Amino acid sequence: DVTFSMLGANGATYYQFF
């Protein structure tokens, strides 16, 4: 989550789905 956090809130949510 922390790494993907850089992309933004949307990026974090997208990673969660996967």
UniProtKB/Swiss-Prot annotation:
Q: Does the keyword Glycosyltransferase apply?
A: no
Q: A GO molecular function for this record?
A: rRNA N-glycosylase activity
Q: Name one GO biological process term.
A: defense response
Summarize the PTM comment.
Glycosylated.
Signal sequence annotation: none
What is the superkingdom listed in this entry's lineage? Answer: Eukaryota
Keywords from the named record: Glycoprotein, Hydrolase, Plant defense, Protein synthesis inhibitor, Toxin
EC number annotated for this UniProt entry: 3.2.2.22
| Catalytic activity line of the entry | Endohydrolysis of the N-glycosidic bond at one specific adenosine on the 28S rRNA
Q: What does this protein do?
A: Inhibits protein synthesis in the rabbit reticulocyte lysate system.
Protein family per UniProt: Belongs to the ribosome-inactivating protein family. Type 1 RIP subfamily.
Q: What is this protein called?
A: Ribosome-inactivating protein momorgrosvin
What species was this sequence derived from? Answer: Siraitia grosvenorii
What taxonomic lineage is listed for the species of origin?
Eukaryota, Viridiplantae, Streptophyta, Embryophyta, Tracheophyta
